Amino acid sequence: MPGPVPLSESDERTWAMVSHLSVLVNLVTGALGPIIPLIIYFVFKDRSRYVAYHSLQSFLMQLIVWVGGGTLTGLAWAVTVPLVFLAVGLLCIPFALLITALPFLALIYGVWGAVETSQGKDFKYWLIGDWVRGLLSA
C-alpha cells in the first residue's frame, strides 16, 4: 500500500500559515487557538515536515503563552493590587501591565509567523523553534 501523498509547496505554505494564524482564534474563544495547530499537526505530520514543524511550533507557543502568560498575569496582579494600599504597589503597576501585554504581543508574533510562512520562509519562534526541530528529528 502506498504511503501518504506529499503536499504541494503551495499547500504546505497554506497549512503552515493557518497554524500560525490560529493564534487569532484566542481573541474570540479565549483558549481554543492551540487546538487548531494540534489538529493540523496530526493530519499532516506524515505528509509534510514543513507543516508538522510549523504546526507543532504554533501549538507549543500558544500553549506556553496561554498557561505561562495567564499564570504570570494573575500572579503579577495578585501581588500588585494589595501592595497598592502600601504605595509600593504603584511601582509594580508598570510591570503588571507589561506582563498583561505579553499575550497580546504573542498574537502579533503569530501573525508575523503566518506572513513569513505564507511567503515560504522558514519562520522560527525564539527558543521554541529549535526545541521543536529537535523533537521532530528524534
Language-model features, listed with the residues they occupy:
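Membrane-interface extramembranous regions at the lipid-water interface
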Residues: 1-64, 112-138
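Hydrophobic alpha-helical transmembrane segments in multi-pass membrane proteins
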Residues: 16-36, 59-110
